[in-house]
Amino acid sequence: MKQIIFISIFIFWDYLCFGATTFVNTDSLQRRISLFGTMLPQEKVYLHLDNTCYFVGDTIWYKGYVTRSDKGTLTDMSKILYVELLTPDGFLVERQQLEMPNGTANGAFVLTDSLYAGYYELRAYTRWMLNFGQYEHPHAQWSEDAFYNKEMAKDFFRDYEKLYSRVFPVYDKPKETGHYTKDMTLRPLRRYFKARKGKPELELKFYPEGGNLVAGTDCNVALELNTEEGEHLENVEIDILDPQGRKITKTRTGNRGRCTFLLNNVGTQEEYKAVFQYKGYDYEVKLPEVEEEGIALKVRQDTLLRIELQRSEGLTDFPEGLALQVMAQGVPQTLQHIDFGDKRKTNVTIPLNELRTGVNQITVFDGKGQIYADRLCFVNRHDYDSARIDIHGIEPQYEPFAPITLNLKLQDIQDTATSVSLAVRDRATEEQTYDN
């Protein structure tokens, strides 16, 4: 009965938002998107851990904060926080359900001696978050045959991209109390998986700025090169060839196997490809197909968010209007109307004080709801740069079991914060890579 009621409400909501008219202008769409983000706000979880790495036998202490997207405050919607600890193999160690009366909760996981070293994962979510970002892990069709029925396979491969997830190292239990060495005895996975011989399998992904390669435009393209196991490959030179095999540009992978290159005047119905060498083997990967009509984006940020738009040659008429919207955490921040006129390029500048610090989504769409370009960008207003709490009283060295007194002072006296989540740890075993 609950499912029937929910479906009926969803259909009625969909009719209110999109069923009144077949085509609506961009202002009306923006208002409805804003209403959707307000009426159905999303939640976001953050866990503050007491350390950056652990040893078998330790206890993981944590505090969880859950905010709502429309207000940017602690949530008052969900009352239960689910926190899961998973082994390096992906098996569930424990799931905790914590009462969350004011948007916060705290708990702990004990790394018992029966566990083993490796890279563990913490996941946290509310039931409300499971309504957003659901997807299915890519897998081969034959892998579903290992399950009794399709429903079991569907449950196994289902995941949610909106969940909080953090991976951290767990090292072997110290042989002597107090002598911590970062030794990690991994399980012998090689008895299950044998390394392939011959040509390594590599994964080269392309990310055109704006989402597509658009004919007749200058397109920025980012790429990422990884091994089959997910290792980032750095300092690999990659040549970009046109359909005739001529080299038109080149690039070299940098940090985390990533880099960018520019394709000038992208040809219609042309197939570009990337060629490179790795460990003496030759590789050739096709770039995404070229779209005949569309809009290319170039986004830059200094004191302003600067966006350059370039349309394809044949894309001239937008009877329902064209607009650019920036959205953060599911809530629209600003809307700019776009008018190319007789030109193929135009620019939009947005003051940073109109946006939120964090990941923002730029979308170019018309009054019919058709999306021409879509891109994520990180906006930094520097409102989180400086520490807001001064800590005094830390000595360079302490005697065993000596009492420690710390003085904490809030810098901004007008700040309304009433509580602090504080973690104290041994700096000798700190792991900066896995810091909060």
Question: Which stretches of residues belong to each language-model region?
Answer:
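Bacterial Sec-dependent N-terminal signal peptides
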Residues: 1-28, 408
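Proline/serine/threonine-rich low-complexity linkers at boundaries of modular beta-sandwich domains
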Residues: 33-44, 179-182, 191-202, 283-289, ...
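Beta-strand-rich structural segments
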Residues: 43-71, 204-231, 303-311, 363, ...
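Beta-strand-rich binding/interaction modules
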Residues: 76-86, 96, 107, 118-124, ...
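Aromatic sugar-binding surface patches on proteins
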Residues: 101-108, 254-260, 334-335, 341-349
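Short, surface-exposed loop/turn segments at beta-strand-coil junctions that are enriched for proline
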Residues: 106-117, 129, 258-269, 314, ...
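Short acidic/polar inter-strand loop motif in beta-rich domains
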Residues: 115-116, 126-142, 278-284, 331, ...
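Acidic glycine/proline-rich low-complexity segments
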Residues: 121-188, 192-196, 286, 415-436
